[in-house]
Amino acid sequence: MPARTERPGAGAGSSAPCWLSPEEVGETAAWIASLQLRDGMVPWYRGGHADPWNHVEAAMALACAGRWAEVGRAFDWLAAKQHEDGSWCTGYVLGGVVEPRRDPNACAYVATGLWWCTGLGGGRSLLEEFWPMVERALHWCLLQQRPGGEIVWSVDPDGVRGTFALLAATSSFQLSLRCAAEAATELRQGPSPWLEAAERATAAVARGCRAVDRLFAGQRGSDGASSEGRASDGRASDGRASDGRASGGRASDGAWPGSDPREWAAVFAPKDRWAMDWYYPVLTGALAGEEARRRVADRWQEFIEPGLGVRCVSDRYWVTAAETAEFAMAAWRAGFATEAAELLDWTRHLRHPSGAYWTGCAHPECVRFPGGQLSTYSAAAVVIADHVLSRRSPAAGVFSGPGEVAAASEEA
């Protein structure tokens, strides 16, 4: 394992041990289940709210432990809350809505969750029961995909779309579409339009990553953003706003960006400081091969806190369990197996005796932040990462690379 002041080297080996024992996986899943409300909703933390993406993530972790009753209740909750147009609100509490906007990426993630659970043992019956719900969600999501392939970050209740896209969200979106294509094939339906839309989203992510790298490589300041290419208000140096609008008024959702890398860099909101923008293109397979390895290596020093985990934000000494677990999967997918194994092991210091996980801690004092919070999405991310790196089932292929995803249902 290279020192964290260095870039990672090639990982050794193609398999890995199980970092969590079956008993530990069971403890963590039991803790997540203990927070599930009577209507099936899984909140972020006890007394907190829920959103569709993290709710699905919790269901995926419950499936890892074979808690199918709770998995079924989680999907039942989604079916009950789905709007007629196929979308969900962004924030829920028991009996109500706290954030009425829609997040297309979160709405699409039900496809990833259902395909994951199918491969873990939910089988064809689970897939058939909830596939209509997934289809409705994705039909709505495709309406939010812009001509360049990226997906808008939000839609207001009255249908007004957000003016910019997020790199991490579009990366996750294309993975969900690919999972939907695999599910459709399993059900002997055609994979289109899901696969075609996924290809467009993947191309948008790749172009966005390359454009930012070309424009701002070597120019990032201590905050992880370009010190020259973007002003403090998030505008590119040519006057292009971070919502993708050119200074002349041409919106990026009205036409496909041209070959100028400045246009593609402006398509996505500038979130360079956030770890998710760094690793999600790799985690979800939007970038692969040498390009993925290079992306992982290039910003390793900015985000890795030696022996502790991954910083949520590059210029803040806050290490989080979810980002560390997710990045471990991204590093694994990029071929850094040894480094990925060690990264996942670092989440141990955030594990609670109950099997829960602290959301994160601020260093150097190691203060639990925020507010000593134990979060279901953090626990779920660690369980899922353990499942992927240890290849406990064919479902691991969802996050470990093409060719394995299609096998996810064969042993169900």
Give, region by region, the residue ranges found by the protein language model:
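Low-complexity, Ser/Thr/Pro/Gly-enriched N-terminal "stalk/linker" regions
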Residues: M1-W53, C64-W88, C141-G149, A206, ...
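Well-ordered alpha-helical scaffold segments within catalytic/enzyme domains
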Residues: P2-C18, V56-E70, Y109-L126, S172-Q189, ...
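Extended ligand-binding clefts on enzyme/binding-domain cores
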Residues: W19-L20, D51, E129-V155, G162-L175, ...
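Hydrophobic core segments within long, regular secondary-structure runs in both alpha-
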Residues: P22-A33, A59, W68-A79, A108-T118, ...
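Aromatic-rich carbohydrate-recognition surfaces in CAZymes
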Residues: D51-H55, A59-R146, L167-T170, L344, ...
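Acidic/His metal-coordination segments adjacent to aromatic residues that form catalytic metal sites
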Residues: W88-P100, V152-A165, I304-P306, A362-R368
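Long, intrinsically disordered low-complexity tandem-repeat segments
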Residues: S222-S252
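CBM-like carbohydrate-recognition segments
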Residues: L287, V313-E323, M329-A412
